[in-house]
Swiss-Prot record:
Single Gene Ontology BP annotation: regulation of fatty acid metabolic process
Residue ranges constituting the HTH gntR-type domain according to the UniProt record: 11-79
DNA-binding region: 39-58
Compartments, as annotated in UniProt: Cytoplasm
The keyword Transmembrane helix is annotated on this UniProt entry: no
Keywords per UniProt: Activator, Cytoplasm, DNA-binding, Fatty acid metabolism, Lipid metabolism, Repressor, Transcription, Transcription regulation
Species this protein is from: Pasteurella multocida (strain Pm70)
Protein name: Fatty acid metabolism regulator protein
Function: Multifunctional regulator of fatty acid metabolism.
Listed SUPFAM superfamilies: GntR ligand-binding domain-like, Winged helix' DNA-binding domain
Length: 241
């Protein structure tokens, strides 16, 4: 196996094969639209059996990385056109140089999406929405507590909006959400800003000022974005592992 790039930390032959192929695609060693080498050649190059390789190829095809064509070479897809949120964790680990901007884009998307579904939740399920804030008064001043509360709050409000798709989106982001949250909420200023935001959001729900929800969320997105931008330089070296 002579891919110049270091591999992710594989724990099994299947993991090794998957990581080799994924990294080769990401580094344009196997560019979008190209054909993968024949199974026998690729299996020998990676050092796994053809059976193991075949299982890996099928899994990567399900995730959108590849297009398996029976009787034809396996073709590499453009993941930005064929994959879903399930590959985000992999992308974060693949390229540490793009990690800060990648996370910023995810946080921006979260702000824009949540501004829609939280307003809807407050309209259609005000009582259920209020229940999502029930642990706010006893929220411990720790990064872990804030990370868990923040994720649970946004997730509960997503399902309260009567559109479960928003909840499924958050489910797919949980691993990354937790990793970013534990780092971000280690900053006392981030926790203080978040607490004020939660209280403001709760008040808007109680008073049914639903037309002010989007602006409240977008302002929090801007303010928290400033804190995040200042923290990016201190991301630990192993953050994307």
């Amino acid at each position: 196996m002579n891919n110049d790039q270091p591999l992710l930390k594989a724990q099994s032959p299947a993991g090794l094969a998957e990581e080799y192929i994924v990294r080769s695609i990401w580094n344009n060693h196997f560019p979008p639209g190209s054909d993968l080498p024949a199974e026998r050649e690729l299996a020998e190059k990676i050092g796994v059996t053809r059976t193991t390789l075949r299982e890996v190829l099928q899994r990567l095809a399900r995730d959108g990385w590849l297009n398996i064509q029976h009787g034809k070479p396996t073709k590499v897809n453009n993941i930005w056109e064929t994959s879903g949120l399930n590959i985000l964790e992999v992308l974060v680990r693949l390229d540490s140089t793009k990690l800060p901007s990648f996370i910023s884009n995810i946080l921006s998307a979260r702000t824009n999406i949540s501004a829609i579904y939280i307003q809807k939740a407050f309209k259609v399920e005000p009582q259920k929405s209020l229940e999502a804030f029930k642990d706010l008064d006893t929220l411990a001043d720790t990064a872990e507590a804030y990370t868990n509360f923040d994720y649970d709050l946004f997730r509960k409000l997503a399902f309260a909006s009567d559109n479960p798709v928003y909840g499924l989106i958050l489910n797919s982001l949980k691993g990354l959400y937790t990793r970013v949250g534990l780092f971000y909420f280690a900053n006392p200023s981030a926790r203080e800003l978040a607490k004020r935001f939660y209280l403001s959001l709760k008040t808007l729900c109680q008073t049914q000022q639903v037309n002010d929800v989007k602006e409240c969320i977008r302002q929090y997105g801007k303010d928290s974005g400033v804190i995040w931008a200042n923290m990016q330089a201190y991301l630990p070296a192993n953050f994307n592992e």
